[in-house]
UniProtKB/Swiss-Prot annotation:
Organism annotation: Leptothrix cholodnii (strain ATCC 51168 / LMG 8142 / SP-6)
A single GO BP: 'de novo' pyrimidine nucleobase biosynthetic process
Protein's UniProt name: Dihydroorotate dehydrogenase (quinone)
Pfam families recorded: DHO_dh
Family indicated by similarity: Belongs to the dihydroorotate dehydrogenase family. Type 2 subfamily.
PANTHER family listed in its UniProt record: DIHYDROOROTATE DEHYDROGENASE (QUINONE), MITOCHONDRIAL, DIHYDROOROTATE DEHYDROGENASE (QUINONE), MITOCHONDRIAL-RELATED
Enzyme Commission numbers on file: 1.3.5.2
């Protein structure tokens, strides 16, 4: 149990610029992880082991990519009780992302808007951080590594970046996620279209099979998709995942829709909206994916989870596992065991 209840620290953090608060929090976790001060935010891990995509997860609740883009805080974040953590998105080369300000709170709706743009230190630094993390994986936690393309890489050459990133992260990942759904990298979502997706996933699957032979183990590969898809688009994506032998899907990323936050301060800021307003759209995509892909295909649900009941709604829609991010910002570490208990059994 955390020694400092999050409701006491949240007003201080929410008094800061959102990105500054984010960096302060990550910096503190990075500094004090694996020390006695980790007890300030640690939570007991709820045991609920489950096998998905051939991996044994300690429980069904994970951290979504984007919170720890550079993999600096894997052990510290793991102390919150997660069964699995996904870090990144990492690109082959470091890049600053979009101009600031680029993160905005909408507290009336427990939501965020961000247009960060895959800001990260690049593959070499990312892998060094991942290799320094020890306690989370030693205690059974699983690690997903999320990959993307550099902003300067033309969309027609996107596969080159993904292949470089896949080869780099493969030896260090329990699973790899291919992020083709961030709205904050120009034209990235075009990779979700029929021919482009088929070509990209075919190239990645060919490389992954070669890497499996090279490293003597098969690392599952997931694809993360957007909530802003109609039924026909989801149907095509599901068929393309199957056709290319992709192991699983993560649904969903942030949304461009603003209906649920219209009229609020910052609602018209460009970027992806996350948090409570995304729950219904994300669950709709999850439910259709489950219908299209069948009962055994691995689905990780993410988007709008701020309570145990929200986590259960993801399971009811068809998700095997559930991730949180924005909910952690609004609810704090206690959200993790709450969701794990709600998903148990």
């Amino acid at each position: 149990m955390a020694l400092v209840p999050y409701p006491l620290t949240r007003p201080f953090l929410f008094g800061m610029d959102p990105e500054a608060a984010h960096e302060l929090t990550l910096g503190s976790i990075a500094r004090f992880q694996n020390t006695p001060l980790q007890c300030l935010w640690s939570q007991s891990r709820i045991a609920d082991p489950v096998t998905v995509a051939g991996l044994r997860f300690p429980n069904r609740i994970g951290l979504a990519a984007g919170l720890d883009k550079n993999g600096r805080c894997i052990d510290g974040l793991g102390a919150m009780g997660f069964g699995f953590i996904e870090v990144g998105t990492v690109t082959p080369l470091g890049q600053p992302g979009n101009p600031k300000p680029r993160m905005f709170r909408l507290p009336e709706k427990n939501a965020l808007i961000n247009r960060l743009g895959f800001n990260n230190e690049g593959l070499a630094s990312f892998l060094a951080n991942v290799q320094r993390a020890t306690s989370f994986r030693r205690n059974g936690g699983l690690l997903g590594l999320n990959i993307g393309k550099n902003a300067v890489t033309p969309i027609e050459n996107a596969a080159d970046d993904y292949l470089i990133a896949l080869a780099g992260v493969y030896p260090h990942a329990d699973y790899v996620t291919v992020n083709i759904s961030s709205p904050n990298t120009k034209n990235l979502r075009a990779l979700q279209s029929d021919a482009a997706l088929d070509a990209l996933l075919g190239a990645l699957q060919t490389r992954r099979l070669a890497l499996a032979t090279e490293h003597g183990r098969s690392v599952p590969m997931f694809v993360k998709i957007a909530p802003d898809l109609d039924e026909a688009q989801v149907r095509v994506i599901a068929a393309t995942l199957r056709h290319n032998g992709i192991d699983g899907v993560i649904a969903t990323n942030t949304t461009l829709a603003r209906d649920a936050v219209a009229g609020l301060a910052h609602a018209d800021e460009a970027g992806g909206l996350s948090g409570a307003p995304v729950l219904a759209a994300s669950n709709r995509v999850i439910a259709q994916l489950r219908a299209e892909l069948g009962g055994a295909y691995p689905i990780i649900g993410v988007g709008g989870v701020l309570s145990g009941a929200d986590a259960r709604s993801k399971r009811a829609a068809g998700a095997d596992l559930v991730q949180v991010y924005t909910g952690l910002i609004y609810r704090g570490p206690a959200l993790v065991p709450e969701c794990a208990r709600a998903l148990r059994g």
